[in-house]
Amino acid sequence: MNFKLRTLLAFSLVLFLGIVSSSPIVPHYLRAIDVSKAVTPKQVENDLGKVLSKGTLIFGPSNPAFADATERWSTHSMPADIQVVIEVAQESDVAKVVKYCHQNNINFLAYTRGHGSTNTVSKFKGIEINLSKLTGIAIQPDKKSALFQGGVYADLIINKLWSQGYIVPTGSNGCVGLFGPALGGGLGRYQGQYGLISDNFVSLNVVLANGTSTTVNAISNSDLFWAMKGAGHNFGIVTSAYIKIYPRKAKTWHYHNYVWSQDKLEKVFEALNRFQGKGQIPALMGVNFGQFSIEPRISETEAVIIWSFAYDGPAAAAEKLLAPFNAIFAISSTKGDVSYSELLVAQQTDINSSSCSSQPYVGSTTWLQTYNVTSQRAIYDLFNKQIAQNPGLAPGARVFFEGYSTKATQTIDPNSSSYPHRDEYLLVFFAVVTPPSLESVGRAWADKTLAIWHASQPGRRPATYVNYAVGNEPLESIYGYNGQLTKLRALKSKYDPLNKFRWYNPIVAY
């Protein structure tokens, strides 16, 4: 190589390094290389069988239990190659498995209930650490908190605590785990009263990427505690946690479900905007769920508008708030007073509901401040147009609207957690069950719906709830525009420098 060429290359390298040092390119030490070894159940049994607790199961795809142990709500987020499932029997087993994977360069993924829409999980190849046996719940002597193990889920928790006169914030669907939603913030019917699930964390028992078990709370590893409350999927596996619990206030919840025809759309959304304002849903009105969907008994070509309100208290107080909606003529109107576990059935979010079924969902999602009525009409018209063109998609197509009370969420210091969306009020998403032949149609429909929502809020940047993200959203929209990603990535270099936790909407690209 002649002197001129060497000089040119050296100058180019200096220039390149200068550009890189000022760019947002992720440092090399956070870029994991996918060299995970292929493993077999027999190999893992030989290596780990004697050190794991009695009752731990190790099996692979040929085992009849494999399908249930790896099932996901959205089949589009099914990992590419789960080679081995380790269904741990004790919390201590999690650290042993992670340490084994760390030492042998094997990818690992924690699993509880398999929810979430993101396609980033589909890239995973390696060992699944299944937490489904870790279902212990222990109310503490002071009756102010309880210890929840990592495999608990909403239906189990609600039934256990309600019968003893207590509640804890959980997600809204009975089939969903506690910690999957919580590590992304954790929305639910009680957040108007008590904040997000993660706002109620007292202390977490966490296994880090190298297999180390550690305590994470406001005193011990406080920086990691901040990260776990909003971006926790990127940092560790929660094997158990102490979480605040509360005495239940009322013996029953009041629900009121409406079905409206399309000609009432403008009236309904105008009434919702007056009722909700921007973050003004009353604390006891835990949630209002809405959807556009085809109901064949009413019409096979025009979607109806379905809305369900849930109030933590007596019917009289709830119906006073719902007077504007009672004034809009409905195709049907049903209401009642039920226990909290029965409320999930009334709102069709119970563990046996269709909303919990595993399907090939395609979708999109965003946050809104309020409903742009013109845009909602455009989304409704698009829905009917797509169904007319592809009637086979009708049974599995929905436009969803979720309005949780955010009263308590807004009172909590935003700097206390990495959760970035305390000033967002309405969560919306589109989902359609798509066979392979219509997947491109479903994705185009999802993109068009999202584009209308985004255009309905001129001047606002897109915002995405991490637990509803589909995997193609800008990271800033998920984790925040105000420096959160910079801080989170610095914490990654401290707690997970090899980026082992990179499967669920990762803050550092795979």
UniProtKB/Swiss-Prot annotation:
<protein>
    <recommendedName>
        <fullName>FAD-linked oxidoreductase virI</fullName>
        <ecNumber>1.-.-.-</ecNumber>
    </recommendedName>
</protein>
<feature type="glycosylation site" description="N-linked (GlcNAc...) asparagine">
    <location>
        <position position="372"/>
    </location>
</feature>
<dbReference type="GO" id="GO:0016491">
    <property type="term" value="F:oxidoreductase activity"/>
</dbReference>
<comment type="pathway">
    <text>Polyketide biosynthesis.</text>
</comment>
<feature type="glycosylation site" description="N-linked (GlcNAc...) asparagine">
    <location>
        <position position="210"/>
    </location>
</feature>
<feature type="glycosylation site" description="N-linked (GlcNAc...) asparagine">
    <location>
        <position position="415"/>
    </location>
</feature>
<dbReference type="InterPro" id="IPR016167">
    <property type="entry name" value="FAD-bd_PCMH_sub1"/>
</dbReference>
<dbReference type="GO" id="GO:0071949">
    <property type="term" value="F:FAD binding"/>
</dbReference>
<comment type="function">
    <text>FAD-linked oxidoreductase; part of the gene cluster that mediates the biosynthesis of virensols and trichoxide, fungal natural products that contain or are derived from a salicylaldehyde core. The pathway begins with the synthesis of the reduced chain in virensol C by the highly reducing polyketide synthase virA via condensation of one acetate and 8 malonate units. VirA has interesting programming rules since the first 2 ketides are fully reduced, the 3 following ketides undergo beta-dehydration, and the last 3 ketides are only reduced to beta-hydroxys to yield the trihydroxy portion.</text>
</comment>
<dbReference type="InterPro" id="IPR016169">
    <property type="entry name" value="FAD-bd_PCMH_sub2"/>
</dbReference>
<comment type="pathway">
    <text>Secondary metabolite biosynthesis.</text>
</comment>
<dbReference type="InterPro" id="IPR016166">
    <property type="entry name" value="FAD-bd_PCMH"/>
</dbReference>
<feature type="glycosylation site" description="N-linked (GlcNAc...) asparagine">
    <location>
        <position position="130"/>
    </location>
</feature>
<feature type="domain" description="FAD-binding PCMH-type">
    <location>
        <begin position="78"/>
        <end position="248"/>
    </location>
</feature>
<dbReference type="Pfam" id="PF01565">
    <property type="entry name" value="FAD_binding_4"/>
</dbReference>
<dbReference type="InterPro" id="IPR036318">
    <property type="entry name" value="FAD-bd_PCMH-like_sf"/>
</dbReference>
<dbReference type="Pfam" id="PF08031">
    <property type="entry name" value="BBE"/>
</dbReference>
<keyword id="KW-0285">Flavoprotein</keyword>
<dbReference type="InterPro" id="IPR012951">
    <property type="entry name" value="BBE"/>
</dbReference>
<comment type="similarity">
    <text>Belongs to the oxygen-dependent FAD-linked oxidoreductase family.</text>
</comment>
<dbReference type="InterPro" id="IPR006094">
    <property type="entry name" value="Oxid_FAD_bind_N"/>
</dbReference>
<feature type="glycosylation site" description="N-linked (GlcNAc...) asparagine">
    <location>
        <position position="352"/>
    </location>
</feature>
<dbReference type="InterPro" id="IPR050416">
    <property type="entry name" value="FAD-linked_Oxidoreductase"/>
</dbReference>
<keyword id="KW-0732">Signal</keyword>
<keyword id="KW-0325">Glycoprotein</keyword>
<keyword id="KW-0274">FAD</keyword>
<keyword id="KW-0560">Oxidoreductase</keyword>
<feature type="signal peptide">
    <location>
        <begin position="1"/>
        <end position="22"/>
    </location>
</feature>
